[in-house]
C-alpha cells in the first residue's frame, strides 16, 4: 500500500481545524472514500481499500455506531460533531475535494490548474455545499444522513462521465479487489510438467484463500473504522462541553454554586412545608380523636340517662294516673246531693288524703265522712226542732245560752270562715277541714245554739245555691301549704315532661349520629380491604376538615355535618367505584363498640 499524498493530508488537517490531535489516517478514510466515489480524487489511495462492501454499507455502519440508542435516528448535535471531526464546515469553503485537488496539482498543466481555481472559486457551488450540511432537522434518519454527506460531495464534484451508478460501483469494486495484472499464457502441458502444474494449482488455491482472508480483514477494518469514528465523535462532544464549561471560569462556578444553593433552599422550604403539613395532620388527627372521645363520653352519659328513662316513665304515668283520678272524682260528684250540706264535708276530705298518700283509695273515707256528716245534721235538726218547741224556757236557760254564745263566739266565727271557704272551694277539701266542720256541728247540737244554727243554716243554703249555680266548677285548696305542694308537683311533672322530651330528642339525635358513624366505619373498612394508601386517606380527611374551616361557615360545625361530609368524601373514592358494592350482610356483621341500645 502506498502512502497518501502529503498535500491532501495537509489540506484535510487545515480544513478540519481539529482542537485535539487525532490519528493521521483513520479519520480520513471516509473522506477519501466519498471523494473517490464522486470523482474528486483521481487515484486509488490506501484509504479506499477499506471499501470492502460498498459506500452505502460503509455509511450504514458509521450511522449504526453513532446511533448508540438504537432508535434509528441521529441527533443534530452528533451529526455536527461528525462533520467537525471529518473537517466539513458548513461555514467554510475548504473541503476534502480542495485538499485532494491541492495534492494532485503537481501532476496537471497550468491550464488545468487555472480551470480548477476557477471552479473552486465558484460561489454558487460553495453555497450549495454549505447548505447541504447546514439545513438538517433536529434528528436525522439514515436516508437523510446519507443524503447530507453524499449531497455535499456531489455538489463539489461537478459534471461526471455519463455512467450509471451500478456500472461505476462494479468497476470500482473490480479495480479494488482484483487489480489489473499482465496475463501470462498458460503453460502447455508437457510430459514433464506434472509437478509444476500441481504446484501452480496449489499456489492459486492459496492465493484465493489469501484473497478471501484479505476481504474479511477489509470488512473488519471497515467496521473498526466506523467504530473508531463514533468514538472520535463522542470524544469531540465531551471535549467541546468541557471547553465551553472552561470558558466561564469562576463566574460559571459561582453561578452553579448559586443554583445549588437555590435548589438547596427550595428543598429545605419544601421539607419545612412537609413538616408543617405533618404537624397539622397530627394536630387535626388529635382533634378528631378528642371529638370521638367526647362523643363516646356523651354516648355513655346518654346510656346512663336512658337507663333512668323507664323509672321516669313509671313516675310520670303514676302522676298522670293520679291527676286523672282527681279529675274523674271531680266529674263524678252527684248533682242531687248538692242540696244537702254534705258536699261541703265531702269536698273537705279526699284532697288532703290524696295529697298525703296517693296510693290508698279515698272512696271508703268519703262514705264514712258522708255518713257521719248526715248523722250530725240530723241531730242538729232534732235539736233545732226541740228548741223551737221549747220557746217558753226559763230565763236561766236563756242567760246560759247567751253566756255560751259569748264563750263560743270565736268558734262560730271560725265555722263561718270554714263555710265561706267551703263555698269558694273548687275541689274537694282535705280531711282536716272536714273534721273541723264536723266538730263544730257536734258542738252546735244543743238547744241553746239556735241562733248560731240559724246562721249556719243560712250559710249552708247560700252554699248550696252557689254550688248549684257554679256546678262545683271551681274550688281552691284548703291551705296555702297544700296549694304550694300541689303547685310544686305540677311543676315537677312539667319539668319531668320536658326532661323526658329532651332525652328522647337526644336519643334520636344520637341514633342518627350512630348510624352515620357506622356508615363511615363501614366505608373505612372497605377502603382498608381495598388497600388504600394512608396518604390518600389522610388527604380525604384533611380536605373534609378544611371544608368546615372555611370562613363562610357560620359557627362551629356539628359532628353530624362533619360525619356526613366525610361519608360523602369516602363514598366518592375511586377505589369504591371500581369495586362492586358490599352485600348487606357485611354491613350487618360489622361490630361497633359505639352502638347504643335504646
UniProtKB/Swiss-Prot annotation:
Residues 343-359 have a biased composition (Basic and acidic residues). Keywords: Coiled coil. The keyword Coiled coil applies. GO terms for molecular function: calcium ion binding. Residues 1-22, 96-127, 175-198, 326-411 are annotated as: Disordered. Residues 54-89 form the EF-hand domain. Residues 175-185 have a biased composition (Basic residues). Residues 394-404 have a biased composition (Acidic residues). InterPro entries: CCD48, EF_hand_dom. Residues 196-303, 479-533 form a coiled coil. This is EF-hand and coiled-coil domain-containing protein 1.
Amino acid at each position: 500500500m502506498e502512502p497518501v499524498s502529503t498535500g491532501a493530508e495537509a489540506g484535510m488537517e487545515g480544513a478540519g481545524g481539529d482542537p485535539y490531535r487525532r490519528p493521521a489516517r483513520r479519520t480520513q478514510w471516509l473522506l477519501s472514500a466519498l471523494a473517490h466515489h464522486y470523482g474528486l480524487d483521481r487515484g486509488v489511495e490506501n484509504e479506499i481499500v477499506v471499501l470492502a462492501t460498498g459506500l452505502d454499507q460503509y455509511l450504514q455502519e458509521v450511522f449504526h455506531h453513532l446511533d448508540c440508542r438504537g432508535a434509528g435516528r441521529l441527533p443534530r448535535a452528533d451529526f455536527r460533531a461528525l462533520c467537525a471531526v471529518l473537517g466539513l464546515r458548513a461555514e467554510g469553503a475548504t473541503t476534502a475535494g480542495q485538499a485532494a485537488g491541492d495534492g494532485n496539482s503537481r501532476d496537471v498543466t497550468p491550464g488545468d490548474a487555472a480551470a480548477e481555481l476557477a471552479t473552486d472559486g465558484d460561489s454558487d457551488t460553495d453555497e450549495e455545499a454549505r447548505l447541504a450540511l447546514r439545513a438538517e432537522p433536529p434528528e436525522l434518519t439514515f436516508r437523510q444522513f446519507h443524503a447530507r454527506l453524499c449531497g455535499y460531495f456531489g455538489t463539489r464534484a461537478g459534471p461526471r462521465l455519463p455512467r450509471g451508478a451500478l456500472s461505476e460501483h462494479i468497476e470500482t469494486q473490480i479495480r479494488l479487489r482484483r487489480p489489473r495484472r499482465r496475463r501470462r499464457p498458460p503453460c502447455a502441458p508437457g510430459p514433464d510438467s506434472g509437478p509444476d502444474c500441481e504446484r501452480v494449482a496449489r499456489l492459486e488455491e492459496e492465493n484465493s484463500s489469501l484473497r478471501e482472508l484479505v476481504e474479511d480483514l477489509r470488512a473488519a477494518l471497515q467496521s473498526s473504522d466506523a467504530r473508531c469514528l463514533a468514538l472520535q465523535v463522542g470524544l469531540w462532544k465531551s471535549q467541546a462541553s468541557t471547553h465551553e464549561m472552561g470558558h466561564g471560569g469562576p463566574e460559571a462556578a459561582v453561578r452553579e454554586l448559586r443554583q445549588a444553593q437555590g435548589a438547596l433552599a427550595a428543598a429545605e422550604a419544601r421539607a419545612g412545608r412537609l413538616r408543617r403539613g405533618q404537624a397539622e395532620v397530627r394536630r387535626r388527627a388529635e382533634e378528631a380523636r378528642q371529638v370521638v372521645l367526647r362523643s363516646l363520653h356523651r354516648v355513655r352519659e346518654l346510656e346512663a340517662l336512658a337507663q333512668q328513662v323507664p323509672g321516669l316513665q313509671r313516675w310520670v304515668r303514676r302522676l298522670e294516673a293520679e291527676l286523672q283520678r282527681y279529675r274523674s272524682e271531680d266529674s263524678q260528684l252527684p248533682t242531687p246531693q248538692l242540696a244537702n250540706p254534705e258536699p261541703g264535708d265531702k269536698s273537705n276530705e279526699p284532697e288532703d288524703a290524696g295529697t298525703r298518700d296517693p296510693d290508698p283509695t279515698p272512696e271508703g273515707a268519703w262514705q264514712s265522712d258522708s255518713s257521719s256528716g248526715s248523722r250530725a245534721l240530723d241531730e242538729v235538726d232534732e235539736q233545732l226542732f226541740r228548741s223551737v218547741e221549747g220557746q217558753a224556757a226559763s230565763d236561766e236557760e236563756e242567760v246560759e245560752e247567751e253566756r255560751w254564745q259569748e264563750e263560743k263566739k270565736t268558734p262560730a266565727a271560725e265555722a263561718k270562715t270554714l263555710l265561706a271557704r267551703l263555698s269558694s272551694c273548687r275541689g274537694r277539701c282535705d280531711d282536716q277541714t272536714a273534721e273541723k266542720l264536723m266538730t263544730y256541728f257536734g258542738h252546735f247540737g244543743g238547744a241553746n245554739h239556735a241562733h248560731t244554727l240559724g246562721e249556719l243554716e243560712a250559710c249552708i243554703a247560700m252554699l248550696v245555691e252557689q254550688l248549684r249555680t257554679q256546678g262545683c266548677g271551681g274550688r281552691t285548696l284548703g291551705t296555702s301549704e297544700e296549694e304550694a305542694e300541689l303547685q310544686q308537683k305540677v311543676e315537677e311533672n312539667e319539668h319531668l315532661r320536658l326532661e323526658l322530651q329532651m332525652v328522647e330528642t337526644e336519643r334520636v339525635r344520637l341514633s342518627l349520629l350512630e348510624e352515620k358513624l357506622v356508615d363511615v366505619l363501614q366505608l373505612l373498612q372497605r377502603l382498608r380491604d381495598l388497600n388504600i394508601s394512608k396518604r390518600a386517606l389522610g388527604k380525604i380527611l384533611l380536605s373534609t376538615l378544611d371544608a368546615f374551616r372555611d370562613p363562610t361557615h357560620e359557627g362551629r360545625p356539628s359532628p353530624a355535618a362533619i360525619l356526613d361530609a366525610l361519608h360523602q368524601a369516602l363514598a366518592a373514592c375511586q377505589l369504591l367505584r371500581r369495586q362492586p358494592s358490599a352485600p348487606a350482610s357485611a354491613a350487618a356483621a360489622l361490630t361497633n363498640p359505639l352502638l347504643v341500645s335504646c
